[in-house]
């Protein structure tokens, strides 16, 4: 799966749940207070279901979730490692 498609799916999910004025793929989601820790849990569940991947404790870090770009890289890594329905 192309990283651009992954980014678009994540962006669509985020904007469905919360108004997205100025949201870009490189927006610092925690620093901008766009997401909170509770919202992050919803994102983890979305990523696992949407892309058919399993995220472990080591994957769930602020570094992996600080931007849409970072989340897309994590998803692509998991898909490439055979950790998803498209990998």
Regions found by a protein language model. Name each.
Residues 1-22, 73-87:
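Thiotemplate assembly-line natural product biosynthesis machinery
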Residues 22, 53, 64:
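Flexible coil/turn residues that form the inter-helical turn or adjacent wing/linker of helix-turn-helix
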Residues 8, 38-41:
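Short alpha-helical elements of helix-turn-helix
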Residues 25-36, 59-67:
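Glycine-rich loop motifs involved in handling phospho/adenylate chemistry
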Residues 54-58:
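Beta-hairpin "wing" of winged helix-turn-helix
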């Amino acid at each position: 799966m192309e990283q651009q498609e992954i980014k678009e799916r994540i962006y669509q999910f985020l904007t469905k749940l919360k108004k997205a004025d100025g949201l870009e793929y490189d927006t610092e989601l925690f620093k901008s207070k766009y997401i909170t820790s509770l919202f992050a849990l919803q994102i983890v569940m979305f990523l696992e279901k949407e892309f058919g991947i399993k995220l472990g404790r080591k994957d769930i870090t602020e570094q992996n979730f600080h931007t849409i770009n970072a989340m897309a890289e994590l998803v692509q890594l998991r898909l490439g490692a055979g950790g998803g329905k498209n990998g």
